[in-house]
């Protein structure tokens, strides 16, 4: 009988990133992966990183180093780095950390289960997955929530058009894309059915909703 694959997950950064983490966890669960606490041994660990400010980047790098040490000790078989730091640094992250097995950019999140399957199956010679920013909002339903049961974050848009000098968000998250109100309502209904009583709307630029 084949062993059930296990995965641990570290979610860093903002609430928007947490929504992405929950979406990836949901997809991995649908593909048969069992989530285990990150202190326990697992087949794979996914680190959903933040790359916004220097302190966040340093935190992400510290967690990558910690998980690579666990890989050396045999506690995990593979390390996948996803999210904003991966999107910002791309393949240079593999040069900095050659023991990382795969990097997945922000817009490759919905392919995380395929990446995990190929990695465990020894099929994935390519070590990076980066997709262009989509022209339509991504569907965040079918999440495995890691917030307390009574509340959840609901992402109503992605990206930003402002390109402020001090901010890297447009380079990591792309241009602003409004999530259609029908999709927002459908996600809200799904979350309410899952026991959520407090919805927190999040976006990179909430005041720009519907103006793109």
Regions found by a protein language model. Name each.
Residues 1-209:
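Proteins enriched for Cys/Gly/acidic motifs involved in redox and nucleic-acid/cofactor modification
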């Amino acid at each position: 009988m084949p062993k059930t694959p296990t995965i641990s997950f570290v979610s860093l950064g903002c609430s928007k990133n947490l929504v992405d983490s929950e979406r990836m966890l949901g997809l991995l669960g649908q593909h048969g992966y069992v989530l285990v606490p990150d202190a326990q041994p697992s087949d794979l660990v996914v680190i959903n990183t933040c790359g916004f400010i220097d302190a966040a980047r340093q935190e992400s790098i510290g967690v990558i180093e910690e998980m690579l040490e666990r890989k050396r000790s045999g506690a995990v078989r593979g390390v996948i780095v996803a999210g904003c730091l991966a999107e910002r640094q791309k393949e240079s992250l593999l040069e900095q950390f050659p023991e990382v097995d795969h990097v997945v950019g922000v817009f490759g999140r919905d392919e995380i289960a395929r990446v995990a399957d190929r990695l465990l199956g020894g099929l994935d010679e390519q070590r990076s997955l980066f997709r262009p920013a989509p022209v339509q909002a991504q569907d965040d339903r079918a999440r495995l929530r890691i917030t307390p049961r009574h509340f959840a974050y609901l992402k109503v848009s992605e990206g930003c058009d402002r390109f402020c000098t001090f901010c890297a968000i447009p380079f990591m998250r792309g241009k602003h894309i409004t999530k259609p109100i029908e999709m927002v309502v459908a996600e809200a209904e799904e979350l309410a059915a899952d026991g959520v009583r407090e919805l927190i709307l999040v976006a990179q630029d909430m005041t720009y909703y519907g103006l793109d």
